[in-house]
Amino acid sequence: MPTVISASVAPRTAAEPRSPGPVPHPAQSKATEAGGGNPSGIYSAIISRNFPIIGVKEKTFEQLHKKCLEKKVLYVDPEFPPDETSLFYSQKFPIQFVWKRPPEICENPRFIIDGANRTDICQGELGDCWFLAAIACLTLNQHLLFRVIPHDQSFIENYAGIFHFQFWRYGEWVDVVIDDCLPTYNNQLVFTKSNHRNEFWSALLEKAYAKLHGSYEALKGGNTTEAMEDFTGGVAEFFEIRDAPSDMYKIMKKAIERGSLMGCSIDDGTNMTYGTSPSGLNMGELIARMVRNMDNSLLQDSDLDPRGSDERPTRTIIPVQYETRMACGLVRGHAYSVTGLDEVPFKGEKVKLVRLRNPWGQVEWNGSWSDRWKDWSFVDKDEKARLQHQVTEDGEFWMSYEDFIYHFTKLEICNLTADALQSDKLQTWTVSVNEGRWVRGCSAGGCRNFPDTFWTNPQYRLKLLEEDDDPDDSEVICSFLVALMQKNRRKDRKLGASLFTIGFAIYEVPKEMHGNKQHLQKDFFLYNASKARSKTYINMREVSQRFRLPPSEYVIVPSTYEPHQEGEFILRVFSEKRNLSEEVENTISVDRPVKKKKTKPIIFVSDRANSNKELGVDQESEEGKGKTSPDKQKQSPQPQPGSSDQESEEQQQFRNIFKQIAGDDMEICADELKKVLNTVVNKHKDLKTHGFTLESCRSMIALMDTDGSGKLNLQEFHHLWNKIKAWQKIFKHYDTDQSGTINSYEMRNAVNDAGFHLNNQLYDIITMRYADKHMNIDFDSFICCFVRLEGMFRAFHAFDKDGDGIIKLNVLEWLQLTMYA
C-alpha cells in the first residue's frame, strides 16, 4: 500500500479488497507553490470551432528575425512584454524595475563567452534554484545544451533584439521566442546572471522559461527534475537517500556516464519544493528584502557606471535567504546540481567523492574535501589537477560520498532514455505516450478510497508482450516504468491553479477479457486487488516508478487523490521490451434491435438524405401508420396508436389531453407539448421534477418531427412518450436517494443502459453540457440528453448510406441538422 513520505504526500490510499478501515485526508505541502485548483480547457476537437475567433498563426523565429532586420527595428515581444505583467501576478509593487537590453547594460555584450558552462549561472533574487540547478547539469551535456540553446545567436551579427530557446512540453519540443529586454535595478540584473558581466545566455534562458510558464513569479519554488525533463524529454526517478540501495554510488556514477542529469537536496521538514519562501513571507516582503540587499551591498549606487565595462566583475549578491543555511555550509530546502563523481587515492585507500554545485555561485560546503580543506595537501598534484580542484568561491565543491549520504535526503535522476539503472548493460527502452484528462463529474473519480467513482477515471490498457533478456534472472518478468505527469499547473498559477496530489494503480486484466477494450466497471475494482501501484500520492508534477510484472495484459488507472479535481495529464510507459499502451475507448454505437415485420418506417426530417432507409432505433408496432400531410389530417381521422378497446387507461388519458390541447389540426407546438408532458409528469410525484422547459420541448419536436412542420401529431407524440417512459425507468434506477437528480458519474451507466455506447470524450462532453454545478443531472436534462443522442444517432445512420461509419455533408445539410435540433 502507498506510504506517507512527507508532509506533502498523501497518506496511504484505501485498502485493497479485504482490508477494511478509512484513511485520513492527505496533508498539503506548505510550499508557496500551492494555490487553488483550476479547470483545464475543453478538448481541442470542440474548441477548434472557435479558432477563427481566437487563433492567429504564430510566426517562427526566423520569420520574426528577418522582419526585424528588414525594418531595422529591435524586437519587442507582444506576448511577454517588458513590463510588470511579465514579472509578478500576485500583487502590484511600488518598486520600478527598469527593463534594459544587454547593449544598454554593458559596452560589449556577448551571448556566450568561451562556451556555456555551469560557472556561468548565478542565482538572482527569485526562488528558482531548482531551475538553475538543472541548467548547471545541462551544461555537462553539450548535445542537449545545443538543442535547448541554439548557438547561432549573437549581439553582433544580425542582432535584432530577438532570441529563441527550445523546451520539451508534454511530448513535443516547442520553440520559445523572446526579446532581450531584462529587468534591472541600479543597472544590475535582478534575476539570473553570469559570472561574466557581459554574458547573457543564462539570463535569457531564464526569461524564455518564465514566458513558457506565464511569468517570472511562476518559477518560484519547484523540483529540479521538472526543469530537467523540460530540457531533455527524459523521465525522472526519485530516491530517498536514507533508504538508498547499497549500490547507490554505482547508480549515480552510471547515470553521470550516460549523460543523465542529477540533482539533490536537503529536506527542511516542510517542503517538497526548493526555493520557496517560508510561511508568511509574501512576494512584497521578498522584493523589499531584495532591494535592501542590493542597496546595502558594498557597491554603492553612486559608484555604479551606468553601462559598465567588460572587465568589471559581476556584482554578485547572495539571494534573499529564505532557505536555511547550516553550520557546515550546506543549505536546507535548496536544490544542488550533482556535477561529477570520482574516486581518489588518499592515505592508502580510495575515497569516493561527489561534486556538487550551489546555483547561488557561492556558499559552499566547508567540511572534508571542501575547497579549503587542509588535507588536500596529502593528495597527489596530478590527482588534484584531474579533479579540477580550485580554491575559488564559485559554488562548486567536492565532498565525500559518506558525507553526501549523511547530509542530503533526496536524489533526483533524469534518465534521458530510461536506461535500467540496476543493470550493468545500457539498454534502450521503448516508450508509449498517452494524453488524458480528468473531468469533474465524469472522469475525475479520485483514488481507490472512493470506490463509487474510482472506476470512472481514465483507463489505459498495457500489454507486456515479451520478457526481459536477463540471463541472471530466471523469472519470466517484464520491466517497465510508468510516469504520470500533470499538465500546465505551473502556467495556470496566476489563475489559482496548484499541483494536484496524483498517483496510479495497475490491475491485471482477466484472461477472458484480454483484447476487450471496454471500460472496466465498478464491480471489477471492488473485487480485484491491484498488482502494482505508485508508492505515494504526492503533489508533484510527475509521479514515476519502476515495476517488474509477468507478461500479460494490465490496466493502468491514473487519478488524483481527491475526486472532482479537473486537469490534463500525460501517461508515459517505458519498457525494456515491446509493449502496447493505449487508452481504453469504447466503440461508439447504438443498440439496433431486429426490425419488426409489417412495420413501416417513420422518416424523420433529418433522415431525408436517405428517405428510403428504415429507422435504426427502437420502434413500437403502433408507430407503423406513417404521417399524412396537414391538409389530409383535417379531412380524415388521425391514425390511432391502437384500437380503443386495447388502449390502456394511460393511452386514453393521453388521447384526451392531446385532443384538448392540439385543436382541430391534431398537432402540438413546443408550448403545447410542454403543457402535455408536464400535465402527465406532474402526476408522477416520485420523479420530484419541476417539469420540462420550453427549450427542452423545442428540442424534442425538432428531433421527432417527420415532415419539418415544427409540430408533433399524436403518433409522433406517442413515440416520444414511449421513449420517455423507458428512460424514466433508467432515471429512477439511478436516483437512489429519490432526490429528483442523478450523480453525473452514474450517467455513463445510464447512457449504456439506454442502448447508447460512447467513448470517454463523449461522456465528458455530456457531463459538461448537462450537469449542474453540483455535478447532478435533473430529469429534464436527463431526457433532453437522451432525445438528442437518439436523434443524432438516427441522423448519422440515415446519412451513412454504405454503413462504413463515415458521412459526408454539404453546408446546407450540416446547418439543417445543427440548427434544427
Curated annotation (Swiss-Prot):
Domain EF-hand: 649-683, 692-725, 722-757, 787-821
Record-stated family: Belongs to the peptidase C2 family.
PANTHER family in alphabetical order: CALPAIN, CALPAIN-3
Protein's name in the database: Calpain-3
Residue ranges with Low complexity bias: 635-645
Biased composition (Basic and acidic residues): 622-634
Region (Linker): 587-649
Gene name of the record: CAPN3
Catalyzed reaction equations: Broad endopeptidase activity
Keywords: Calcium, Cytoplasm, Disease variant, Hydrolase, Limb-girdle muscular dystrophy, Metal-binding, Nucleus, Protease, Repeat, Thiol protease
Residue sites binding Ca(2+) 4 per the record: 800, 802, 804, 806
Annotated binding of Ca(2+) 1, by residue: 662, 665, 667, 672
Keyword Repeat: yes
Quaternary structure note: Homodimer; via EF-hand domain 4. Interacts with TTN/titin. Interacts with CMYA5; this interaction, which results in CMYA5 proteolysis, may protect CAPN3 from autolysis. Interacts with SIMC1. Interacts with UTP25; the interaction is required for CAPN3 translocation to the nucleolus.
Binding of Ca(2+) 3, residues: 735, 737, 739, 741, 746
Annotated active site: 129, 334, 358
Region annotated Domain IV, chain positions: 650-821
GO molecular function: calcium ion binding; calcium-dependent cysteine-type endopeptidase activity; catalytic activity; cysteine-type peptidase activity; identical protein binding; ligase regulator activity; molecular adaptor activity; peptidase activity
UniProt note on tissues of expression: Isoform I is skeletal muscle specific.
Chain intervals for the UniProt region annotation (Disordered): 7-37, 609-652
Regulation: Activated by micromolar concentrations of calcium and inhibited by calpastatin.
GO annotation terms (biological process): apoptotic process; calcium-dependent self proteolysis; cellular response to calcium ion; cellular response to salt stress; G1 to G0 transition involved in cell differentiation; muscle cell cellular homeostasis; muscle organ development; muscle structure development
